[in-house]
Amino acid sequence: MYKIIEVKQSVFEDNNKDANKLREECKDKGVFLLNIMSSPGAGKTTTLSRTLERLKDRMRIGIMEADIDSDVDAKTISEYGVRTIQLHTGGMCHLDADMTRQGLHEMGMEDLDLAVLENVGNLVCPAEFDTGSTKNVAILSVPEGDDKPLKYPLMFQVCDVVLINKMDVLPYFDFDVEKCKENILYRNPNAKIFEVCAKTGEGIDDWCNWLENEVKAWKE
């Protein structure tokens, strides 16, 4: 006699329970946890940099940079004078709730209004694991194509916000902005969409205003 155990399902269930506990902990401590996801090179770090330029003097912010290896992004972000830690995943392509909790506690979450997790660059794995975040953000860049929401459904289903980035190169790519929005809303009718260019700053103010209002509402 033997018993079959669906390991993957069990892992997800355990993580989801842990994520809900972490979300409650963040709520109790007034910490808004933002999980930023995208493919490699979509502009997570540059978008985060532009966000910090606008918000770092208006709230207490801490950043967790998750990568398989290296500390390139952490060095870039730390130059903005905010609390920054580097999380090495040891080959894993995502963070889960327990890893996120470790990062938050190491960073000293009690003194923060906004904690940002820049997840590992990947459109698949990070979407599968709830980090305990208050809100999830996906960044989709113009060069990637307007069909990505159809090809990677879960990423866009779990996100509260989608930033369509690199709008400055729109004339050079076969990218239909309205079609992209249609594809995003097909996967997630409730998604908030911003057209931005982290390089030029286009649309970043609107994004930051939304985020600041969400943080304030979370802390009430």
What does each of the following model-derived ranges do?
Residues 2-24, 28-37, 42, 46, ...:
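Nucleotide-state-sensitive switch-loop elements of NTP-binding domains
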Residues 66, 141-142, 198:
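Cofactor-binding loop segments of dinucleotide-utilizing enzymes, especially the Rossmann-like FAD-
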Residues 70-74, 148-152, 176-182:
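Short, glycine/polar-rich helix-capping loops at beta-to-alpha or helix-loop-helix junctions
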Residues 86-89, 140, 165:
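Short beta->alpha connector loops at strand-helix junctions that form conserved
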Residues 110-114, 143-146, 150-154, 158-161, ...:
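Helix-rich effector regions associated with P-loop NTPase G domains
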Residues 122-125, 132-150, 160, 167-174:
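Conserved Switch II/interswitch segment of TRAFAC-class P-loop GTPases
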Residues 170-220:
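Canonical P-loop GTPase G-domain recognition
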